């Protein structure tokens, strides 16, 4: 149960961190943490990594 709670709060923190990295136009800047399933990187960038990664130039 404690492991689940830790995972839950880690996920919550990650979501909050993600939203602070998003610029006004709604895209993630270079080297921002991103999810490969929900790629919101700015133009000419792609989320590189396995499941989670960083926005890098294409």
UniProtKB/Swiss-Prot annotation:
Disulfide bridge partners, by residue number: 27-42, 34-47, 41-55
Which tissues does the record link to its expression?
Abundantly expressed by teratocytes, which are extra-embryonic cells released by parasitoid wasps into their hosts during larval eclosion.
Q: What's this protein's name?
A: Teratocyte protein CftICK-III
Where is this chain primarily localised?
secreted
> Which UniProt keywords are present, listed alphabetically?
Disulfide bond, Secreted, Signal
Query: What is its subcellular localisation?
Result: Secreted
Q: What is written about domains in the entry's comments? A: The presence of a 'disulfide through disulfide knot' structurally defines this protein as a knottin.
What does this chain do?
This endoparasitoid wasp peptide has immununosuppressive and insecticidal activities. Suppress cellular immunity which is detectable as a reduction of hemocyte encapsulation in the host. In vivo, ingestion of this peptide (probably at excessive doses) increases larval mortality and reduces leaf consumption in both lepidopteran species D.saccharalis and S.frugiperda, which are permissive and non-permissive hosts for C.flavipes, respectively.
